[in-house]
């Protein structure tokens, strides 16, 4: 198989693009590096396209390895014909390859094998020819020493051989699989006779069936979980009569005369005992894999939006980790994230020390000039919000508060990483510090947590964990490199996601910084232990230095392009220090007005179109953060209760999670409301991600409120 050609066709990319990308990947270049700094070679493939290409490349290379292994195995058995070899070489999917290999695959001792050992293969062939009198033919094979005592025994053994042969016919299996996928149903029922509190979750699936072809992924994952918990019985129902009729046609049973009953029995046995269970397992696996891929895609998109939330810079933040019995843990951090103060207060039940608690908060706000309170959304959050809101009203304070998603905070605060970062803090102090820092720079703080613990997925614990981890780590890597990091302030956790930087090198960078002080130039990276020329090439462009020796070090311009960037500045008549005052914004316009325009500049400086464009963009806004374009979180000063909601109310909210059937929106009542997929838009919506993404600020209308069950139904239509 021509892998390059196959990728080109499957992903609708030019062959040259694929060739270049594959070569770059094979040379050890990372996806973020290729996407950003090798656009000329790939004709501008972005990180998403490169990830898809990389995944396809890995799949096809594994397929080739498997193909070679299968050919070798069949050849060793002495059964590799030219026709079979041709079919194996032409197989373009793993399923097709395995179908062709099935008859030759080493397997445990089967009924068909036992029948062959007893010498009944010729009788099986005779039934297909067919013979005039199968019973008389069978008598020739009676052999007491082989335990074939009667003609009926012989015919039964012959049927076992035929059943196995039919089940291993690649063309039959392919047709049956496709037919079952197209016309099959997935059905579920309650396993136990009586309902239990645990089974209530799955009441929609107690008597349920849906076409395999159209069932959405989230239902497959729900059925899988119900089956795993032994609450649901889940089965597939296929068009059996049509399938049996098709096999009979292929075997040409109607022309077999007296052999017909035996062939029909062999076909029925083949399908029910061998083919159907095998195809059912395959289809369940196909559906699960597709559902998992869909769920991982949604999780990845949600994670990306969460990581790319707008940072709140230059603000002193008070982090508030709410609690009841153990109290509310407080930490104040300055604009750089440095911890200024910590305390613990008890404004919530059972102590209800509101007055004393808020006196402490008032003291901290005054002492450190706090701008914003970052309140975690966990246990006692609602009670804490009421206390904060009452305090702000009473004080007529300009301080605002924001509800911060604290998913994963408890995991982080008890982790080895948190212990290393804050050795003298207890778990509560670490958690409240994390609340504050999450608001200041979500990306820098969230990279410290296992992406699976961030809680923006669906059925995440029911899917392939290694695949999920791999995909989510790629998302984090792409986000971190898209934003870039400050080389002099970034944690080892953040640095470890930078292109070309391993966890060991990340720790070495921090150690070098602590020993030698701040980096003054990107070139100094080469002095870091284990950071060689290749790692420097891959990472340098994503690491920023503010106030260093080289002004270009604070931009996304790669050191390999510094000479070109400086020549461009000279052509535009702009001094490097003028970039800080915004003069770089004029560069594109100035260069375009030169004789020959930008094309002339490309030729004069021997630079590619993509690189030229990227340098112009980088110098227009040195140190620009792409997250600046994202809506800032909603700052609140008043509290809204669930009971305050009325049908028809129009509110502003933040999308907190996107799933297959809709989006959950935080409207400030400590219970996210659901905008069902049907209420997202007046137009048809294939998937919620086509309309909203996590972190979006949206207007919603209240459709209904169930206070007892804490359920809110919202709509984004007609608002």
Q: Where do the PLM segments sit?
A:
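Long, charge-rich intrinsically disordered scaffolds of nucleic-acid metabolism proteins
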Residues: 96, 402, 408, 413-483, ...
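Short, ordered loop/turn segments at secondary-structure junctions
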Residues: 37-39, 128, 239, 322, ...
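Accessory alpha-helical DNA-binding modules that contact the DNA backbone or grooves
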Residues: 30-31, 42, 46-145, 482-629, ...
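Low-complexity, acidic/Ser/Thr- and charged residue-rich accessory regions of DNA metabolism proteins
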Residues: 141-151, 208, 237, 244-271, ...
């Amino acid at each position: 198989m021509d892998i390059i050609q196959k990728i080109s066709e499957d992903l609708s990319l030019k062959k040259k693009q694929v060739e270049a990308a594959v070569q770059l990947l094979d040379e050890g270049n990372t996806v973020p590096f290729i996407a950003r700094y090798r656009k000329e070679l790939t004709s501008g493939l972005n990180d998403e396209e490169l990830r898809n290409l990389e995944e396809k490349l890995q799949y096809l290379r594994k397929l080739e390895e498997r193909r070679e292994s299968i050919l070798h195995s069949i050849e060793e058995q002495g059964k590799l014909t030219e026709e079979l070899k041709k079919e194996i070489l032409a197989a373009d999917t793993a399923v097709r390859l395995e179908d062709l290999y099935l008859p030759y695959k080493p397997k445990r001792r089967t009924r068909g094998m036992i029948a062959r050992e007893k010498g009944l293969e010729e009788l099986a062939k005779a039934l297909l020819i067919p013979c005039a009198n199968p019973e008389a033919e069978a008598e020739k094979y009676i052999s007491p020493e082989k335990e074939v005592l009667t003609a009926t025994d012989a015919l039964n053994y012959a049927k076992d051989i035929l059943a196995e042969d039919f089940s291993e016919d690649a063309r039959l299996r392919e047709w049956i699989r496709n037919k079952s996928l197209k016309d099959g149903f997935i059905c579920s029922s309650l396993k136990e006779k009586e309902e239990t509190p645990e089974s209530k979750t799955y009441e929609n699936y107690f008597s349920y069936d849906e076409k395999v072809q159209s069932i959405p992924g989230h239902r497959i994952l729900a059925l899988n979980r119900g089956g795993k918990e032994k609450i649901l019985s889940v089965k597939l129902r296929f068009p059996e009569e049509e399938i049996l009729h098709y096999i009979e046609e292929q075997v040409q049973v109607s022309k077999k005369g007296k052999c017909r009953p035996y062939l029909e029995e062999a076909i029925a046995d083949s399908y029910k005992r061998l083919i159907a269970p095998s195809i059912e397992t395959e289809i369940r696996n196909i559906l699960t894999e597709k559902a998992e891929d869909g769920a991982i895609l949604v999780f990845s998109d949600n994670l990306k939006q969460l990581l790319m939330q707008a940072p709140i810079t230059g603000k002193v933040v008070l982090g508030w980790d709410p609690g009841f019995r153990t109290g509310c843990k407080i930490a104040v951090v300055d604009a750089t994230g440095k911890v200024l103060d910590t305390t613990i207060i008890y404004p919530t039940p059972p102590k209800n020390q509101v007055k004393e608690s808020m006196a402490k908060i008032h003291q901290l706000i005054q002492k450190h000039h706090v701008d914003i309170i970052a309140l975690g959304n966990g246990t006692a959050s609602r009670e804490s919000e009421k206390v904060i809101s009452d305090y702000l009203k009473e004080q007529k304070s300009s301080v605002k508060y924001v509800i911060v998603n604290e998913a994963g905070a408890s995991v982080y605060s008890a982790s080895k990483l948190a212990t290393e970062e804050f050795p003298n803090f207890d778990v509560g102090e670490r958690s409240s510090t994390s609340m504050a820092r999450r608001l200041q720079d979500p990306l820098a703080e969230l990279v410290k947590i296992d992406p699976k613990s961030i809680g923006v997925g669906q059925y995440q614990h029911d899917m392939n964990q290694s695949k999920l981890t791999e995909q989510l780590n790629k998302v984090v890597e792409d986000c971190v490199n898209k934003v870039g990091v400050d080389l002099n302030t970034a944690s080892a956790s953040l640095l470890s996601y930078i292109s070309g930087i391993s966890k060991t090198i990340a720790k070495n960078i921090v150690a070098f910084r602590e020993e030698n002080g701040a980096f003054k130039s990107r070139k100094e990276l080469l002095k870091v232990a284990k950071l060689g020329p290749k790692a420097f090439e891959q990472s340098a462009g994503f690491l920023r230095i503010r106030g260093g020796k080289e002004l270009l070090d604070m931009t996304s311009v790669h050191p390999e392009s510094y000479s070109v960037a400086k020549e461009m500045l000279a052509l535009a008549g702009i001094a490097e220090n003028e970039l800080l005052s915004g003069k770089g914004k004029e560069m594109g316009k100035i260069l375009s007005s030169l004789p020959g325009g930008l094309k002339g500049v490309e030729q004069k400086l021997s630079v590619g179109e993509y690189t030229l464009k990227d340098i112009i963009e980088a110098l227009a806004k040195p140190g620009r953060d792409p997250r600046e374009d994202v809506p800032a979180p909603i700052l609140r000063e008043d509290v809204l209760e669930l009971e305050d909601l009325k049908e028809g109310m129009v509110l502003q909210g933040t999308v907190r999670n996107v799933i297959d059937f809709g989006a959950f929106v935080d409207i400030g009542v400590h219970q996210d409301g659901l905008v069902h997929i049907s209420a997202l838009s007046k137009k048809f919506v294939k998937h919620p991600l086509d309309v909203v993404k996590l972190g979006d600020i949206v207007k919603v209308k209240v459709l209904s409120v169930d206070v007892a069950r804490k359920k809110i139904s919202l709509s984004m239509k007609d608002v």
